Amino acid sequence: MKQPNLKEIVRLQFNRQAQKFSSWSVTKNQEYADYYFNFCEMAPGDTLLDVSCGSGDFCIFCAQNIGHATGVDLSDKMIDLAKQQAMESGIANTTFRRGDAVSLPYEAETFSIVISKSAFHHYSDYHTIFSEMKRCCYRQGRISIQDIVAYDDKEVNDFFESFEQLVDTSHKVACSKSFILDLYQQHNVDILSTMEITIDLNLNDYLNHAVRSDKDTVHLEQFLETGLKDDVIKNYFQYKEKDFFFKRNVFVILGQKKSR
């Protein structure tokens, strides 16, 4: 039997977990949305393309303060949720459609800002996708990526890569910060600003935002138990206000497409 490729794994996984992902506290976090909106320097006249928009929450947030927000995602269920949420919110200046990030269904130079938020760790065709983001962006428009990034310590990073793949089978790999910086430079996009922040993620909340088999759940619990006995790994976990959290670095970058 032919094994599904990464793209099909991502599509099927997000179709299965669309409602869970949409309801996740991180997806709904208005403080995170406001921070990223301001980081991207969005303004009333902007037209936004959100590549791999998920359930459309950030598009809907932005649409209240810009000209128009467009979201595209590989998952049918995610797009259905995005349309439903926009309608229920009474936000008319949004458009959502199913599409593939490696071949975006838009004309060249259609949007003033093109972003990919919390999605690059599901990709493998980084250069193709970034080229498509750049193609769809105005000349002198902005291009932004926001995503989790690799840990500096190899032992720690190896642990969390295995952890992420057990949590969600659609996880490919968290890119390094240097890889993302190189991506901008190799595609001749000027870097305007960058920021790396460490956030504390609620472990139980994080585990519940994705779906997995009972077998994988047991494996994940055993894997975490082993990791928490490691003198290095355990430092990335902590109890806070009766909940268990783990540390994850997030990198945000904003660039500008050249005028020619």
At which residue positions do the language-model features occur?
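Conserved Class I S-adenosyl-L-methionine
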Residues: 55, 192-260
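A short His-aromatic
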Residues: 121-122
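Class I SAM-dependent methyltransferase SAM/SAH-binding core
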Residues: 49-51, 55-103
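Short alpha-helix
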Residues: 173-188
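A conserved beta-strand element that flanks and buttresses the S-adenosyl-L-methionine
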Residues: 115
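A short glycine-rich, Lys/Arg-flanked "PGG" loop and its adjoining helix->strand segment in the class I
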Residues: 127-139
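Conserved class I S-adenosyl-L-methionine
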Residues: 1-43, 57-61, 78-81, 89, 144-166, ...
